[in-house]
């Protein structure tokens, strides 16, 4: 069997909820041995948003595949001793507790690197150093303070959260990049290092084009935005692409909530598009023929396209536009996505067996490595690997394991 990309890398996963588990799950998919350390009562998401009684929720199972689970009360003295040994044996340690929580356990960065000078210690917090450092953050808080919400929505409406989990899972991806870079640098230096990623910072990185436009505003209105008024900050612009090529979501038949196709109008696409919508004369009309001429009339342009698209189902609109190499995509509902044969074939929508809840559907790995294929396996039951890790790897005796359990240490 082919060795995995991160085979031999041991990850001590002290994360919970979403931002941290999304990162460590990616590491597990890449072949790392990820040991999820949970309090004896377990990660809170095991019981959150349950769809079935008395089993791990989808919230938990979909973020913790391919991991092992151990339980440990890190507030107890024996728990701290065991945690010390786990740190000593690990290549990577990841946590996303509230600010200062791990330090208060007695495991500051100075202490951690004293235990294991080669360890890469990654932390996720809401904010960087400064006035917000001690503040708690959740997904939408990070969106609010990272530039996403103020620029999402329509001009005359309130700021909106995006459905994409850019604050949590988006931060997780950034953490993985930092961990991999630190592991690579360790090959040259022989020592580990601290990796810190703030959720606000990760969201801002994903919103950088809006910071670009903030600076462009000083030179005049943003012509590619459909907005009528511009102040001194980047406005919400609905479904406008905000890029060099204008785009919009146009309605399709029969008019359901997701009967839309997003269309990008490139310069080369205007001539075939004008023919498709039954207005071939616009390809030569100087009022419409060039991107510069169309720019002040983007709303009218997409209105003309919608007059055509609204008479056809979105899949037919997709087919006709793609026949002319016009960039577009139908708005897919979550039901359509979970039933999409191509996503199943690409192992992006995968069915995973679970020992208690039966099969569940989850997202597969978007990272496709030719020499390190991913097989998504079930999330672990709470403490499922206690004996395997504590007895088989740390060398504790069976009797001590029983005492640890009866005394609430594990």
UniProtKB/Swiss-Prot annotation:
<dbReference type="GO" id="GO:0033611">
    <property type="term" value="P:oxalate catabolic process"/>
</dbReference>
<keyword id="KW-0808">Transferase</keyword>
<protein>
    <recommendedName>
        <fullName>Formyl-CoA:oxalate CoA-transferase</fullName>
        <ecNumber>2.8.3.16</ecNumber>
    </recommendedName>
</protein>
<feature type="binding site">
    <location>
        <begin position="18"/>
        <end position="19"/>
    </location>
    <ligand>
        <name>CoA</name>
    </ligand>
</feature>
<feature type="active site" description="Nucleophile">
    <location>
        <position position="168"/>
    </location>
</feature>
<comment type="pathway">
    <text>Metabolic intermediate degradation; oxalate degradation; CO(2) and formate from oxalate: step 1/2.</text>
</comment>
<feature type="binding site">
    <location>
        <begin position="243"/>
        <end position="245"/>
    </location>
    <ligand>
        <name>substrate</name>
    </ligand>
</feature>
<comment type="similarity">
    <text>Belongs to the CoA-transferase III family. Frc subfamily.</text>
</comment>
<dbReference type="InterPro" id="IPR044855">
    <property type="entry name" value="CoA-Trfase_III_dom3_sf"/>
</dbReference>
<feature type="binding site">
    <location>
        <begin position="96"/>
        <end position="98"/>
    </location>
    <ligand>
        <name>CoA</name>
    </ligand>
</feature>
<feature type="region of interest" description="Disordered">
    <location>
        <begin position="221"/>
        <end position="245"/>
    </location>
</feature>
<dbReference type="InterPro" id="IPR017659">
    <property type="entry name" value="Formyl_CoA_transfer"/>
</dbReference>
<feature type="binding site">
    <location>
        <begin position="72"/>
        <end position="75"/>
    </location>
    <ligand>
        <name>CoA</name>
    </ligand>
</feature>
<dbReference type="InterPro" id="IPR050483">
    <property type="entry name" value="CoA-transferase_III_domain"/>
</dbReference>
<feature type="binding site">
    <location>
        <begin position="136"/>
        <end position="139"/>
    </location>
    <ligand>
        <name>CoA</name>
    </ligand>
</feature>
<dbReference type="GO" id="GO:0033608">
    <property type="term" value="F:formyl-CoA transferase activity"/>
</dbReference>
<dbReference type="GO" id="GO:0008410">
    <property type="term" value="F:CoA-transferase activity"/>
</dbReference>
<dbReference type="InterPro" id="IPR023606">
    <property type="entry name" value="CoA-Trfase_III_dom_1_sf"/>
</dbReference>
<comment type="function">
    <text>Involved in the catabolism of oxalate and in the adapatation to low pH via the induction of the oxalate-dependent acid tolerance response (ATR). Catalyzes the transfer of the CoA moiety from formyl-CoA to oxalate.</text>
</comment>
<feature type="binding site">
    <location>
        <position position="104"/>
    </location>
    <ligand>
        <name>CoA</name>
    </ligand>
</feature>
<dbReference type="Pfam" id="PF02515">
    <property type="entry name" value="CoA_transf_3"/>
</dbReference>
<dbReference type="InterPro" id="IPR003673">
    <property type="entry name" value="CoA-Trfase_fam_III"/>
</dbReference>
<comment type="subunit">
    <text>Homodimer.</text>
</comment>
